[in-house]
């Protein structure tokens, strides 16, 4: 019987017991006798009922033990795939409740409503602007083609090795698109397929041809707030698009071949290898600390672009690619590709009629994030002349995808930068989301009332707290974050895990789940922050609470011993390991902002951790040596604490 059904613990022995047992017969006899409250009939009925219930309890306990043992064995033999397969199939109950939509009661109507919504979203903000840019592009492209002959592409031939590299970059286990092909088809196919694909891709580049199926996608609406039990509005959904696997392979080939034409400013931290949110937060924290140390209040403007990826103008993008001298074959191929972009919406078992995407990058496309970064790169270039500077680096504007944060030493400078943003976004046919764009201050003058910061439309609110890349920045005399909301998310996730496990008592399994699924919530981006002892204590308490509940104790010394013998370190020591690993990567980072700021200011951060654990400087064998040093330090701490008691 499937684990998702109501009585997954039921087995054939219980069925036989139910048939052969006198439980039902004694119950019927008791009912026929008028349901007496005493006497031999009443005693017989209760005895049979108890026997039957005990058999059910035994079956339930056996099933829970079996699941727990399977999970434990998967951990012991280091089979993470099997572990999560067992967890999802036998522990996580699959919800049978359909997502309810406001004013819609059937899948056909829902699919049509989503189709209309997504087709409207993927249209230009200004149709006249789009027509004007289309004419401008057509004129520019005719001149561009006359300068760059098509035979210049003969040197850009795709080979089987490049196709293999592209296939290796794609994640496994993703859903198939219209063609029903998945990555597993390519990884298990005959090697000659790679040669055939290489010839196909080469011909596509030379002739600027794109197969029509490369432009097809299936959009699946996902609610932005999945935990809400209320009826959802259509506007509260975002689309996840499934693209053909062969188009993804081709896009990876394009990324590898034409990377030099797609480079962007180091102030853009998204869509780059070995660079992420932690790097952006690290640079932000150091810039603010640097200015506060020099008695200057930093003014921050957190700007959000409304539906940035869905409103990208194709013709502006192609003209930007031409300015970068992208081969004309590639530009024309992208033009044809985007003109063939059609999506269908799938809701339940219903598939909508296709609709054309008139604006926005292709959802689910491998090239899409990089093309968007190219699209907004000129904005960062213009802002480089304004705002904060540090060691000769322009750090006045930092960007992660479509999230912009401006840093200025004065309100006047911040106002000037915001107006520049508005002007540049108008040239891109993009608009600010004024409801999500805010400003705040950090430094000694953070409490002073300030004049309004205005955009081309309205004023931006001054706030005391805002969310940036998953961390909650707080206005104050120094750089600080609010961890209370992080702790709330952590408690919610940990309670969900413990509720799923129920009475299954296996600390190894529970700790593995908490460490892999819940602890990342609590420790998100900590390596980029310089945590005080107070902040570490605040974060340590919820992590210790999990051990208190699991091992049924409130003694901190016992909790430390449990952490030692289970191999799960406290937050402060895990923070040290993550921070030192992060610093060792910053030294060789390809991002000039991260690398130069670390070389100029990272010495104190490293010295603090090195002194605490008597470490040497970070080097290549960090993982094997530094982790052992931190664990030994924790072991010595626990040993001393035990001896003192």
Language-model-detected regions and their locations in the chain:
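Short, conserved micro-motifs composed of acidic
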Residues: 153, 349, 430-465
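Surface-exposed loop/turn segments and immediately adjacent short secondary-structure elements
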Residues: 80-235, 241, 245, 249, ...
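Active-site palm subdomain of RNA-directed nucleic acid polymerases
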Residues: 254-269, 371-407
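Conserved catalytic palm subdomain of right-hand nucleotidyl-transferase polymerases, strongest
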Residues: 172-181, 219, 232-242, 279-322
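Catalytic palm subdomain of template-directed nucleic-acid polymerases
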Residues: 307-324, 399-426, 443-444, 475-477
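Non-catalytic, peripheral interaction segments enriched in hydrophobic/basic residues
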Residues: 1-4, 10, 55, 64-66, ...
């Amino acid at each position: 019987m499937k684990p998702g059904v109501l009585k997954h613990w039921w087995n054939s022995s219980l069925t036989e017991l139910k048939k052969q047992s006198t439980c039902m017969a004694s119950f019927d006899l008791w009912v026929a006798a008028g349901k007496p409250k005493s006497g031999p009939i009443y005693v017989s009925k209760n005895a049979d009922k108890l026997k039957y219930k005990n058999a059910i309890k035994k079956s339930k306990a056996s099933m829970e033990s079996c699941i727990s043992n399977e999970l434990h064995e998967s951990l012991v033999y280091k089979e993470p795939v099997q572990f999560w397969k067992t967890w999802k199939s036998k522990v996580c109950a699959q919800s049978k409740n359909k997502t309810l939509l406001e004013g819609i009661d059937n899948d056909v109507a829902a699919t049509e409503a989503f189709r209309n919504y997504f087709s409207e979203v993927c249209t230009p903000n200004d149709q006249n602007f789009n027509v004007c840019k289309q004419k401008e592009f057509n004129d520019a492209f005719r001149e561009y083609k006359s300068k760059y002959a098509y035979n210049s592409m003969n040197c850009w031939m795709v080979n089987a090795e490049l196709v293999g590299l592209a296939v290796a970059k794609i994640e496994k286990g993703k859903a198939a698109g219209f063609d029903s092909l998945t990555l597993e088809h390519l990884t298990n196919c005959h090697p000659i397929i790679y040669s055939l694909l290489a010839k196909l891709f080469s011909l596509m580049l030379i002739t600027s041809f794109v197969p029509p199926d490369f432009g097809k996608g299936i959009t699946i609406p996902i609610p932005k707030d999945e935990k809400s039990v209320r009826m959802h509005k259509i506007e509260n959904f975002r689309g996840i698009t499934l693209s053909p696997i062969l188009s993804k392979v081709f896009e990876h080939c394009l990324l590898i071949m034409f990377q030099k034409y797609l480079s962007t400013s180091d102030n853009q931290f998204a869509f780059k290898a070995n660079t992420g949110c932690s790097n952006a937060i690290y640079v932000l924290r150091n810039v603010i600390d640097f200015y506060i140390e020099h008695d200057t209040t930093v003014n921050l403007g957190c700007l959000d672009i409304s539906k940035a990826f869905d409103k990208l103008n194709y013709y502006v993008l192609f003209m930007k690619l031409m300015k970068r001298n992208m081969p004309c074959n590639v530009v024309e191929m992208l033009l044809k590709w985007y003109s063939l972009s059609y999506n269908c919406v799938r809701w339940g078992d219903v598939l909508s009629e296709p609709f054309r995407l008139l604006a926005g990058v292709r959802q689910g496309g491998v090239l899409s994030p990089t093309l968007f970064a190219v699209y907004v790169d000129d904005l960062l270039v213009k802002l480089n002349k304004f705002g904060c500077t540090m060691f000769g680096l322009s750090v006045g504007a930092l960007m992660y995808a479509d999230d912009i944060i401006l840093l200025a030493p004065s309100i006047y400078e911040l106002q000037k930068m915001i107006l520049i943003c508005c002007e540049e976004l108008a040239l891109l046919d993009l608009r600010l989301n004024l409801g999500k764009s805010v400003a705040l201050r950090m430094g000694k003058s953070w409490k002073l009332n300030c004049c309004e910061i205005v955009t081309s439309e309205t004023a931006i609110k001054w706030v005391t707290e805002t969310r940036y890349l998953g961390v909650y920045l707080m206005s104050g005399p120094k750089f600080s974050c609010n961890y209370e909301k992080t702790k709330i998310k952590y408690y919610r996730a940990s309670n969900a895990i413990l509720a799923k496990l129920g009475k299954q008592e296996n600390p190894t399994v529970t700790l593995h789940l908490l460490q892999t699924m819940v602890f990342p919530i609590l420790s998100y981006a900590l390596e980029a922050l310089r945590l005080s002892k107070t902040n570490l204590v605040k974060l340590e308490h919820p992590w210790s609470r999990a051990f208190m509940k699991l091992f049924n104790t409130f003694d901190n010394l016992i909790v430390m011993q449990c952490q030692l013998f289970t191999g799960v370190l406290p937050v402060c020591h895990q923070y040290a390991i993550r921070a030192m690993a992060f610093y060792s990567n910053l030294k060789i980072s390809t991002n000039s902002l991260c690398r130069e700021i670390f070389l100029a200011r990272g010495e104190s951060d490293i010295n603090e951790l090195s002194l605490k654990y008597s470490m040497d400087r970070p080097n290549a064998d960090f993982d094997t040596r530094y982790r052992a040093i931190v664990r030994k330090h924790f072991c010595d701490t626990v040993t001393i604490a035990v001896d003192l008691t």
